[in-house]
A protein has these predicted regions:
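Residues immediately C-terminal
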Residues: 110, 303-304, 310-311
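The Walker A (P-loop) glycine that initiates the GxxxxGKT/S ATP-binding motif of P-loop NTPases
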Residues: 221, 285, 307
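Peripheral, non-AAA+ core regions of ATP-driven protein-machinery
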Residues: 1-218, 222-228, 331, 471-472, ...
């Protein structure tokens, strides 16, 4: 008897329908066709043991499994459960009546228990688009899949539950999540707040400007000056995630398998801080079977690269294009995968190898050449893509001893949200553009053209600092953001002056 089970394959952050056809023939082997990977081919032994351990009889015949369409690579052990159910249906142990109404996915242990899978959320979205009645999957993934409306999600722990449900012997309890209620309730829960930061008013201001316009920022300062501490507080002043952003962010983490069991919706912006020993594949994504890298896991959030010059030069260079395109394309021989990568880059570095150049009390032992060589580990094109470069000085004793709390993250966030609202209105007719940092060159000329005094100020700065054309655009974008924070319609000279002040590494005398 031929049975058909509905499953799914994840491509990028979306899912594609896979039909698993199972039939029995003479002999005693298992044949799986349809471009399966090694894990899928190995499922035959897991399925055999799981069926027998669950109290059913594995058919003493050749089991032929066809996974269509055949041109899509089937990866991972998530096909164990649908293959097992298809096998039992072909052997007339499971009634086939309900198989066309449910998507079934799950990895099987040898005892028949069902283990978690990757990509449950995009699969659930596909099941709804296919107008299926429900989605049967591991209980550990039920919460993330249940955020999809108009779809019944059934989390199971054991294959026997699925068999009894499909045979009409038991009713499974659907997992229900009130997505909007959970999204609203979880907003604004941050472990760190800028009110805890002593001093550093100029750095706080730079962070406010960066968040208001979605700009990348570099912090240059000695060890212990508070670079990492302040970077951790950055998500607390970014605008809240919209529901659509939260869904997209959760999809990426679902595909990567980084969601904790029981997680429904990611409601705060991601903050990723990879170690400087990270490989290019781990940073941008890829591998034999592509999966999202750190830049995609930071989508709609913050990617913090601490001690930037310590990263391998190759690692940093592969990040240049995603910074511009806000997505990463991974090409393989037979297919291409795209992952979103619209993140805010926050980088930090010491000013020199010893770390104390410019320190008010500790002498630097590096030569000017050593300082220049240290910076040269970061390419010019990458530095050009960082809009704000701010020097972080150590906090003095009086500021440390001051018990008066600083301005709260909530107060800063309100100004950031107001500036972003101005930008949303400005770019309402420009698809894919949401903030000043994303403006094209023509948009910069249209929306960020300074007044005559500001233009002359910018001309002098460009000529003296020998800046690139990209740096010119960056200054105007930052100046536009500063004007938005003030509620100013036009970009004036004081906005240009402040924006130029955030180009620390462009100063010719910075390294002595």
């Amino acid at each position: 008897m031929l049975s058909k089970t509905i499953a799914a394959a994840v491509q990028g952050i979306d899912a594609t329908m896979v039909t698993i056809e199972t039939t029995l023939d003479w002999g005693n082997q298992v044949v799986i066709v349809g471009l399966p990977d090694t894990a899928v081919k190995e499922s035959s032994e897991r399925v055999r043991c799981a069926i027998n351990e669950a109290g059913f009889q594995y058919p003493n015949k050749t089991v032929v499994v066809n996974m269509s369409p055949a041109d899509i690579k089937k990866e991972g052990a998530a096909y164990d459960l649908p293959i097992a159910i298809g096998t039992l249906a072909s052997d007339e142990v499971v009634k086939p009546d309900l198989l066309s109404r449910y998507m079934i996915m799950g990895e099987l242990s040898l005892d028949g228990s069902v283990r978690s899978i990757k990509g449950a959320l995009p699969m659930a979205i596909l099941a709804r688009e296919l107008k299926l009645e429900g989605f049967i999957l591991p209980k550990a993934n039920a919460s993330e899949a249940a955020i999809v409306n108009n779809l019944k999600v059934y989390g199971v722990d054991h294959i026997s539950q699925v068999v009894k449900f499909l045979n009409g012997e038991v009713e499974l309890e659907a997992t229900v999540v009130d997505t909007r209620a959970e999204f609203a309730q979880a907003q604004g829960n941050f472990p760190y707040d800028f009110s805890e930061v002593k001093g550093q008013d100029n750095v706080k201001r730079a962070f406010e400007v960066a968040c208001a316009g979605g700009h990348n920022i570099m912090l240059i300062g000695s060890p212990g000056s508070g670079k990492s501490m302040m970077a951790k507080r950055l998500p607390s002043i970014l605008p809240p995630l919209s529901l659509s952003e939260a869904l997209e962010t959760t999809k990426i983490h679902s595909v990567a398998g980084s969601l904790k069991s029981g997680t429904t919706l990611l409601t705060t912006r991601p903050y990723r801080s990879p170690h400087h020993t990270i490989s290019p594949v781990a940073l941008v994504g890829g591998g034999t079977y592509p999966s999202p890298g750190e830049i995609s896991l930071a989508h709609n959030g913050v990617l913090f690269l601490d001690e930037l010059p310590e990263f391998n030069r190759t690692v940093l260079e592969v990040m240049r294009q995603p910074l511009e395109d806000r997505q990463i394309t991974i090409s393989r021989a037979k297919y291409t995968t795209n992952y979103p990568a619209s993140f805010m880059l926050v980088a930090s570095m010491n000013p020199c190898p010893c770390g104390y150049y410019g320190h008010p009390s500790k002498p630097c032992v590096c030569t000017a050449y050593q300082r220049q060589h240290y910076l040269s580990k970061i390419s010019g094109p990458l530095l050009d893509r960082i809009d704000l470069q701010i020097e972080v000085q150590p906090v003095n004793f009086d500021e440390l001893a001051n018990r008066t709390p600083g301005e709260s993250s909530e107060a800063i966030r309100r100004r950031v949200v107001q500036a972003r609202a101005i930008q949303s209105l400005r770019f309402k007719d420009s698809p894919g553009i949401h903030s000043n940092a994303q403006m094209t060159t023509s948009m910069v000329h249209q929306y960020a053209e300074p007044d005559a005094e500001g233009l002359e100020l910018l001309r002098n700065a460009i000529e003296r600092m020998n800046m690139s054309a990209r740096a010119y655009d960056r200054i105007l974008k930052v100046a536009r953001t500063i004007a938005d924070l003030e509620g100013s319609i036009s970009v004036r000279s004081q906005h240009i002056m402040e924006a130029i002040g955030y180009r620390t590494l462009d100063r010719s005398n910075y390294f002595g």
